[in-house]
């Protein structure tokens, strides 16, 4: 049964219902001081006000007085909380570097998402390294840093051609035995290499005062392959070496005449000269095209005798004393009957 009467409890109920509705609409009037949990307290105030409005006549005067004190205290703390919110918002606006004066719609509620500021992940740095992976592994394995700097560093140019370049890595060489007389030195393979493309070093022959032959400014080249020289017994004619000229060659890089000497200074006399062949003129009849008719046996024999081995037509030469006759040569005396 609903008994609506105008008493103190009913008046208190109307006040609580109006306060709850006002707390709800505070979000639209002053959104800077409103909070999300105000909706809950506005619903509680509206419900309590309706109960007192319709059922307040059942309460005793002492109970109505208790409801009045409780409602007054609640309204006081609600007003004080809203005032403190306004003060805090004003201080935050003054201390902020910029003022947010955006217009807020009365029909829609705008809430900004509060996102945590995350630190960016460390991305691997892309290294533009042109060296191979094997070189990087060698560098990490403990190889000294200055190992490859001598090769990568460009060689500075000398001011003049007479100034020999400096060698960053000097190496000792083998000492050369001194001969009784100065013999001409023919160009040969660089020391440290043999004709079999093998590398051999005589560590016992290194001396501190030996001349350094590795400081030649010209790039080192592999010596060309030389044919084995015939032995003294099998050599038909002794080979003669060219005599060195009295004027020493112009060597601007050091006193080493064998460095600038040409490689082919000694004539190639390893093989015996070819045998002399008499000059035989060519007939014009041989140059004319021959008919394709079948040949006669007589013409064939004549052609074979004409185009025979020129060695058989040349005069025989008596061998010199101590010289063997050439192999494969026909002995004319065997055919003379």
UniProtKB/Swiss-Prot annotation:
Compositionally biased spans, kind Acidic residues: 113-123
Q: Which parts of the sequence are annotated with region: Disordered? A: 111-337
Q: What InterPro entries does UniProt report for this protein, alphabetically?
A: Uncharacterised_Ycf66 (IPR010004)
The highest taxon in the source lineage is Bacteria
The Basic and acidic residues compositionally biased stretches are 133-143, 253-269
Enumerate composition-biased segments (Polar residues). 304-316
Q: Which family does it belong to?
A: Belongs to the ycf66 family.
What is the protein name given in its UniProt record? Ycf66-like protein
**Organism, per UniProt?**
Synechocystis sp. (strain ATCC 27184 / PCC 6803 / Kazusa)
Q: What is the lineage of its organism?
A: Bacteria, Bacillati, Cyanobacteriota, Cyanophyceae, Synechococcales
């Amino acid at each position: 049964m609903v008994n609506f009467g105008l008493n103190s409890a009913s008046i208190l109920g109307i006040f609580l219902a109006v306060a709850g509705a006002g707390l709800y609409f505070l979000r639209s009037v002053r959104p800077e001081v409103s909070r999300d949990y105000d909706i809950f307290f506005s619903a509680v105030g509206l419900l309590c006000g309706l109960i007192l409005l319709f059922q307040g006549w059942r309460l005793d005067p002492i109970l109505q007085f208790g409801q009045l004190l409780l409602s007054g205290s609640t309204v006081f703390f609600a007003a004080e909380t809203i005032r403190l919110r306004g003060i805090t918002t004003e201080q935050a606006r003054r201390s902020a570097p910029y003022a947010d004066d955006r217009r807020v719609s009365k029909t829609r509620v705008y809430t900004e998402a509060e996102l945590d500021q995350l630190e960016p992940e460390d991305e691997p740095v892309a290294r533009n390294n042109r060296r191979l992976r094997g070189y990087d592994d060698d560098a990490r394995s403990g190889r000294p840093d200055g190992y490859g700097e001598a090769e990568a560093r460009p060689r500075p140019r000398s001011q003049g051609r007479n100034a020999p370049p400096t060698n960053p890595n000097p190496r000792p060489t083998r000492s050369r035995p001194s001969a009784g007389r100065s013999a001409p030195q023919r160009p040969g393979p660089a020391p440290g290499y043999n004709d079999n493309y093998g590398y051999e070093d005589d560590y016992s022959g290194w001396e501190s005062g030996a001349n350094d032959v590795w400081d030649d400014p010209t790039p080192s080249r592999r010596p060309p392959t030389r044919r084995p020289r015939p032995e003294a017994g099998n050599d038909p004619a002794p080979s003669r070496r060219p005599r060195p000229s009295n004027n020493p060659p112009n060597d601007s890089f050091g006193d080493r005449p064998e460095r600038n000497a040409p490689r082919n200074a000694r004539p190639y006399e390893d093989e015996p000269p070819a045998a002399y062949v008499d000059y035989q003129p060519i007939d014009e009849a041989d140059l004319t095209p021959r008919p394709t008719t079948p040949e006669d046996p007589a013409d064939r024999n004549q052609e074979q005798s004409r185009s025979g081995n020129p060695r058989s037509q040349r005069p025989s030469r008596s061998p010199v004393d101590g010289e063997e006759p050439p192999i494969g040569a026909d002995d004319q005396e065997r055919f003379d009957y």
